[in-house]
Amino acid sequence: IWTIDNENLKNLVGKEFEIWNKNQINQDTKISKKNPTWTRNERIIVLKYYFDSKDPVELSKDKNKCQEISTILKALNKISETSFESDNFRSIEGVRRKILNFCSIDPEVEESGLEHIAKGDAEIFSEFLKKGEDKIKEIDTMFEIITRPIKK
């Protein structure tokens, strides 16, 4: 059985190994930069816009509104104790997909949204759906509390 450790391999193939190894490390680092699971507060922020919208499907297509939501989520992330560093954290596309997830669950939306719904999305949506008209007031209050630290 042949065994070659990194040092022996480096001696055998020289610079090519160093370049390959650096590229591999960079790839591994990029792979580990997957966005974390959405938090309850992040979902509430999206729901605020969702329930305020007359047409959630159109909201998902409104790049400016999705950018606004994304900006709020990123600002909250920066002041969080568990801040996540990534260029695509809660991107416009991520926000759009979250809105479409909620569209999939919403019995009032005729168009279908996305097929695979996160358990947390279904739970929080049904929780607020049960509250009827009170859901808007409660979400507005929660939104104000959640975003207070970034409104200074």
For the regions a language model picked out, list residue spans one by one:
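Intrinsically disordered, charged low-complexity linkers and terminal tails
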Residues: I1-K152
